[in-house]
Amino acid sequence: MLAGHSAGGNLVAAALIKDAEAHHLKPCCALLEYFPVDNTVDPVNRLSPELQANEFWVKRAQTEKLYTDFYVGDADPADPLCSPLKADETALAAFPECLILSAGEDSLREDTEAFALRLVKAGVCVTAQRILEAMHGFTTNRTPGWEYALKKHIQFFREHLQEDNS
């Protein structure tokens, strides 16, 4: 079982993409939440025109750009290990069953959900849900939506742990 929030979700996706041919990891499932999947796009450009007019969202996106620059460093941002949305279907088809949660009030929402859809199209069993009232980091910061998400985590992990023990 693998799990990651935000950049950690990106790392989980990268590990699974890298492992698509070798199959050394063999996780029973993966939990990925509100994570960046396309680091080729400037976060400010991801904002809708309405959000681009809102100083709060622009500042958040500018901060996200700083994080992205630190995270990507000298790597090619189009590399699927950096931008999982760019992975080929064969790599995505090797993913285990996934629970993917997006935050309704997060600039990464659209990308996270697009990645979930790519996995579904690759034949992966995916449970994806947008937590409407949630902001980025809601599960770790215990902000609106975190309790519901925690229940989803527990249910998902229990199902897979029981399957592994059967």
Model-derived regions, located:
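Alpha/beta-hydrolase superfamily serine-hydrolase fold, recognizing
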Residues: 1-166
